[in-house]
């Protein structure tokens, strides 16, 4: 057993230990598995990793053999990571947190998994999420992940934070990094609640082929790391051109030209990350940072609108705790000390989406898109994309959406509500997305009727 400590170890630390012989890839995987057993499956039972890669130790042994022969596949060879339950990882189930897909087996890898496997990184397992990523901290097939910092707080935003398992696993050092996925803010919310770095890419920068979709116009891969240096390591591997566009709506649609990833990425992300505090200060000097008033209790007009957003009432006033505002002020002072400007700003993109104040429109009333389009984008397109995902995967047991009991996509959520109620936990908030489920089920049923 190696004495190397993986807690809070960065990718560079892990690679250095591997290169020096202080630890082997097998010992790294074993160390992470011990942490998972101690804190995820027992003790505080954080419940972040829900599907394990039984080949992880064998893959680590392969990495060690490559290292002994100086035949490494890349800078992440031997580095363990996790991925959300919405990623296809060949041979593992890919339930996306839904009872209906509990036994769906991935016949191939998602693009990001494929890239990491090709580079020698080792998948520890898949992380928790609500059913089909529809929500945030609602419990799905595997329940939900809990906060590694404070049992009284959520590890992601309740309404939109479906990559909660990835956030917990990465923050708790159950792997070097995690792969989340995002439609609204499902990648950023767990990062915010767990002091992590998250990268939400522009369309087409990271291929989403092989990821379960929710709303294909918005779905993106979102890596989670503990530092920006680690983020650069991951992006150097997964930001790459993908010739196969199936399952990636923006790259497959013919109307808007999306540049190839190789045309928009730097030669090396690692080379653009400052290596010390002095270099970081130079990067920040002269930059202008905006702090939205609505998030620090400084916008009296926020939250007074009477409009409705896509799924119901939105645009409520955000009441931020003083302890959080204090942290805003500390961060602002640090930026100013580095030579940056920090200014209070309005956030019209939010106001115009949520109708959060008198006179502001919502996405439904602004006139840029019709209510019919919103229905088709969020419901009909979701049903179509689920069917296409299943067909592209090719599991003979679940070859398409037509053979799926549509109600189990949603009623699994109801089953979890029954379990929660039996524990004496209030279920009112758990059922927050019930109307969404009803609408999605209707779209699935309509799709099945046309097949």
Language model features by range: what are they?
Residues 96, 141-143, 352-380:
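Charged, often glycine-rich, active-site loop that binds/positions anionic groups
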Residues 1-68, 91, 330, 337-340, ...:
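An N-terminal boundary/leader segment
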Residues 42, 76-221, 249-255, 292-294, ...:
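Short glycine/serine-rich loop/turn segments
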Residues 13-16, 263-274, 297-301, 309-316, ...:
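Serine-dependent amide/ester hydrolase catalytic core
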Residues 22, 29-30, 273-280, 318-346, ...:
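Acyltransferase
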Residues 197-323:
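A short helix-breaking turn/cap at a secondary-structure junction
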Residues 26, 63-80, 230, 277-292:
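Immediate post-signal peptide segment of exported/extracytoplasmic ligand-binding proteins
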Residues 13-20, 101-104, 219-226:
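Short, well-ordered beta-strand elements within core beta-sheets of diverse protein domains
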């Amino acid at each position: 057993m190696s004495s190397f400590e993986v807690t809070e170890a960065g990718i560079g630390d892990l690679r250095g230990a591997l290169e020096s012989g202080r630890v082997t890839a097998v010992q790294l995987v074993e160390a992470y598995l011990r942490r998972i057993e101690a804190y995820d499956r027992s003790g505080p039972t954080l419940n972040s990793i829900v599907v394990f890669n039984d080949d992880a130790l064998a893959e680590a042994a392969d990495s060690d053999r490559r290292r002994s022969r100086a035949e490494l596949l890349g800078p992440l060879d031997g580095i363990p990571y996790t991925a959300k339950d919405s990623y296809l990882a060949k041979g593992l189930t890919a339930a996306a947190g839904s009872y209906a897909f509990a036994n769906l087996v991935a016949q191939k890898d998602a693009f990001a998994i494929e890239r990491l496997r090709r580079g020698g990184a080792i998948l520890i397992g898949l992380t928790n999420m609500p059913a089909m990523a529809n929500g945030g901290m609602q419990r799905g097939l595997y329940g939900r992940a809990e906060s590694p910092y404070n049992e009284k707080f959520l590890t992601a935003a309740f309404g939109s934070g479906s990559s909660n398992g990835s956030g917990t696993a990465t923050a708790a050092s159950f792997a070097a990094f995690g792969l989340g996925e995002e439609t609204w803010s499902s990648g950023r919310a767990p990062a915010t609640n767990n002091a992590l770095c998250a990268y939400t890419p522009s369309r087409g920068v990271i291929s989403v082929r092989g990821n379960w979709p929710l709303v294909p116009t918005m779905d993106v891969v979102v890596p989670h790391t503990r530092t920006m240096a680690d983020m650069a390591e991951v992006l150097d591997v997964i930001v790459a051109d993908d010739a196969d566009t199936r399952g990636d709506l923006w790259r497959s649609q013919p109307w808007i030209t999306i540049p190839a990833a190789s045309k928009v990425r730097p030669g090396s992300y690692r080379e653009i990350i400052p290596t010390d505090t002095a270099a970081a200060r130079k990067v920040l000097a002269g930059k202008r940072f905006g702090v939205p008033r609505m998030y620090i209790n400084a916008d009296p007009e926020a939250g007074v609108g009477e409009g409705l957003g896509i799924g119901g009432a939105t645009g409520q006033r955000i009441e931020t705790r003083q302890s959080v505002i204090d942290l805003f002020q500390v961060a602002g002072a640090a930026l100013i000390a580095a030579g940056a400007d920090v200014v209070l700003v309005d956030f019209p993109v939010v106001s115009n989406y949520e109708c959060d104040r008198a006179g502001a429109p919502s996405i439904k009333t602004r006139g840029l898109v019709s209510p019919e389009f919103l229905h088709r984008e969020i419901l009909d397109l979701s049903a179509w994309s689920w069917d296409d995902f299943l067909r592209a995967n090719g599991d003979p047991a679940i070859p398409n959406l037509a053979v799926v009991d549509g109600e189990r996509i949603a009623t699994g959520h109801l089953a979890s509500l029954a379990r929660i109620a039996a524990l004496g936990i209030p279920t009112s908030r758990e059922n927050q997305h019930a109307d969404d489920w009803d609408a999605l089920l209707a779209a699935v049923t309509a799709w099945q009727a046309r097949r």
